[in-house]
Regions:
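Append "and occasionally in soluble cytosolic enzymes with long acidic Gly/Pro-rich linkers
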Residues: 39, 61-148, 152-153, 212-214, ...
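Short beta-strand-to-loop elements that line the ligand-binding cleft
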Residues: 1-3, 20-21, 40, 131-133, ...
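A ligand-binding cleft/hinge motif common to bilobed small-molecule-binding domains
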Residues: 22-33, 185-190
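Ligand-site clamp/hinge motif
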Residues: 1-29, 156
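Bilobed periplasmic-binding protein-like "clamshell/Venus-flytrap" ligand-binding domains
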Residues: 81, 121-138, 175, 179-185, ...
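Short, hydrophobic alpha-helical packing/hinge segments within bilobed ligand-binding/sensory domains
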Residues: 7-8, 16, 26-27, 66-67, ...
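Short, solvent-exposed loop/beta-turn-alpha elements that line the ligand-binding surface or hinge
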Residues: 29-41, 48-63, 97-114, 120-124, ...
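Periplasmic binding protein-like
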Residues: 148-202, 237
């Protein structure tokens, strides 16, 4: 059933046992209602801001001072708690919580004064960029919040909202200055994300490649980590890579999703992993 309002009605009336993909408003309306319970399960889905360092139309995009300032200009709590109503939580590294090796620290917070100081020290004035974004939640919601919060740090964002296919095409063609994007691992291993965000051999269309960012040391680190036979050492290498990208990279990792499922209170044994395909209905009973 495509309409989330209809799915909410079915689960509330007892005509369905499980309801998925409900909007934030539908979830909020069902919280605490008799006969149903809301499950919030971490998802591997992450939203991030990427600067296209290869776009020469705006030289500011390749300046690490802008990247650093941007990390302090996102209202992380306002986005996740107020605007997205708990359907996402703050997470600031490229491996999602739940994947082995993921950092769970969140070193950045909204601090426009700190961002202004970073920009001033770098001699950056009249900072501005265009931001490609899909014209639907949660992407446009995040982008509009950034437009307001970045302005408090003296950075002007011009939003370029469009259909998802158009944003995708512009990013693939490397025509964007910056973009709000979604990432989900292709498979359940740290290399899926590391090879996307840290690796750019100049040939493949990784996230790093699409944003013109190429660091030979990170290429070597990515290949070393995936080939490391010792599990503990391998996790340590991924933690080092995450710390390096937190320190300096053209990405601002904003949040991680929660898969919110509504089930009737007589449904037992529902389990779901990080990825959408990690659901085991054979364990469900009522």
């Amino acid at each position: 059933m495509p309409d989330p309002a209809s799915r909410r009605l079915l689960i509330q009336q007892g005509d369905a046992d499980v309801a998925r993909d409900l909007g934030a408003d539908q979830i909020a309306a069902l919280q605490g209602k008799p006969g149903v319970k809301v499950l919030s399960i971490p998802s591997a889905e992450q939203n991030y801001l990427a600067f296209n360092t290869g776009n020469d139309a705006n030289p500011l995009l390749k300046n690490p001072a802008l990247w650093e300032a941007a990390r302090w200009l996102v209202d992380y709590d306002g986005i996740t708690k107020d605007l997205l109503k708990g359907q996402y939580f703050v997470h600031q590294s490229f491996l999602p919580v739940g994947l082995p090796g993921a950092l769970d620290n969140n070193p950045f917070k909204f601090d426009p004064a700190k961002a202004k100081a970073i920009l001033a020290k770098a001699g950056i004035k009249d900072a501005h960029f265009t931001l490609d974004v899909e014209n639907k939640p949660p992407f446009i919601t995040i982008a509009q919040s950034m437009q307001a919060s970045f302005a408090q740090g003296g950075v002007k964002i011009d939003l370029l909202p469009a259909a998802g296919s158009q944003v995708y095409a512009r990013v693939r063609a490397k025509q964007h200055q910056a973009a709000i994007r979604l990432w989900i691992p292709d498979y359940f291993d740290a290399h899926s994300n590391a090879s996307a965000f840290a690796y750019n051999d100049g040939k493949s269309s990784t996230v790093a490649g699409l944003n013109g960012w190429q660091i030979p040391e990170l290429n070597k680190a990515t290949l070393a980590a995936v080939a490391e036979p010792d599990a503990a050492k391998r996790l340590g290498l991924y933690k080092q890579m995450q710390e390096e990208l937190q320190r300096s990279s053209p990405y601002v990792f904003v949040d991680q999703g929660k898969t919110q499922i509504v089930v009737r209170d007589n449904v037992k044994g529902y389990q779901q992993g990080l990825n959408a395909d990690m659901v085991w209905y054979d364990r469900v009973s009522k």
